[in-house]
């Protein structure tokens, strides 16, 4: 199978994989639609060992079948070894940022994995997104990273995926100075 020229490598957070199901609940429906669009448009899912373990523990039945299809079509990228850009050390070095030091390490793997691929994250995490944005300069984030929440607006997210999932067309964690 030949990949589309617009094929991108996207991180799909475990919270999206867990939420995506056949249920007609708005969040489940939104996450499912976005993951189905990734498959149709031949974008690739990026998984590190940490993320794969999280997926195995928390994924829905829909997500399990979706990942099986992605792997079968060779639409997956395994990051090995896991990226380590020093972000975790810089998070723990933040002064006067107790909340940030407590919250950001839980999801720093998403940011590091995105920086090691195409700078694209699908996640429902809004608090940590705000913290990464607030501390982008101190963390020395090298370039903007798209952080897209499928539950915010599924139709817009699906359209974004269908048109090539470009970083510049999404809400982003800014590059640090």
Where are these regions (language model features)?
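Short, surface-exposed acidic-centric catalytic microdomains
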Residues: 44-89
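Acidic, PIN/NYN-like endoribonuclease modules and their adjacent C-terminal/linker elements
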Residues: 4, 120, 126-177
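Active-site neighborhoods of divalent-metal-dependent phosphate/nucleic-acid chemistry enzymes
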Residues: 78-134, 173
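Short N-terminal binding/cap micro-motifs at the start of the first secondary-structure element
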Residues: 18-23
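Non-catalytic pre-domain segments flanking phosphatase-related domains
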Residues: 1-9
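The start of beta-strands in P-loop NTPase/AAA+ ATPase cores
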Residues: 8-10, 119-120
């Amino acid at each position: 199978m030949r990949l589309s020229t617009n094929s991108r490598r996207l991180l799909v957070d475990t919270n999206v994989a867990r939420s995506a199901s056949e249920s007609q609940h708005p969040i489940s429906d939104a996450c499912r639609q976005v993951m189905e669009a990734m498959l149709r448009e031949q974008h690739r899912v990026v998984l590190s060992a940490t993320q794969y373990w999280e997926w195995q523990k928390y994924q829905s039945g829909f997500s399990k079948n979706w990942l099986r299809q992605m792997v079968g079509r060779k639409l997956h990228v395994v990051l090995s070894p896991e990226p380590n850009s020093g972000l975790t050390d810089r998070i723990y070095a933040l002064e006067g940022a107790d909340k940030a030091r407590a919250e950001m390490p839980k999801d720093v793997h998403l940011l590091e994995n995105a920086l090691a691929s195409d700078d694209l994250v699908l996640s429902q995490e809004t608090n940590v997104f705000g913290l990464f944005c607030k501390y982008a300069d101190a963390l020395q984030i090298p370039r903007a990273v798209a952080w897209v929440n499928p539950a915010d607006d599924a139709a817009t997210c699906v359209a974004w995926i269908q048109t090539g999932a470009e970083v510049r067309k999404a809400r982003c964690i800014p590059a640090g100075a």
